[in-house]
Amino acid sequence: MIFTIGNKIYVNQTFKKSFQKANINYSKFSAQPTILNNVLWYAVAETDKNYTMAFYSIFDNNTRPTNFINIPKNHTLVDVNHPDIRTLRWFSNEFYTLSSLNNNQVIYKDLRYPLLDQKDSTSSLFSFKLIKEGKRWNTKSLSEERF
């Protein structure tokens, strides 16, 4: 536990410096260890139009992350102040992206957790299909459709 706290402080500073060095002007960011890990860390930073993600291992030869993944927010695809969407926004601590399927369906991806595949920006661990039914947005887990 003590190592995790120490690593958290170190990794936060490392990500802040790497975003600054890469000229990524963020309004907020979050860094956390990957699942069941204290060595490999993940961060997501919010900019005006995108989220920028990076991974960093405390055993890396590099002193900071250098590979960044940019994902557009697309927050204009739905009314983000709709009560159903506000609940999802709260759940994901405002770190989310949207992508359109069709007029009544949107994919909501929670970005708090690392991508399942670093090379695939759509491989979010928590993804939901939002289905517009009347005045409500109903959710269906995309993991149900994957398996």
Residue ranges and their predicted role:
Residues N25-K28, I35-F147:
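Extracytosolic and intramembrane catalytic regions of membrane-associated proteins
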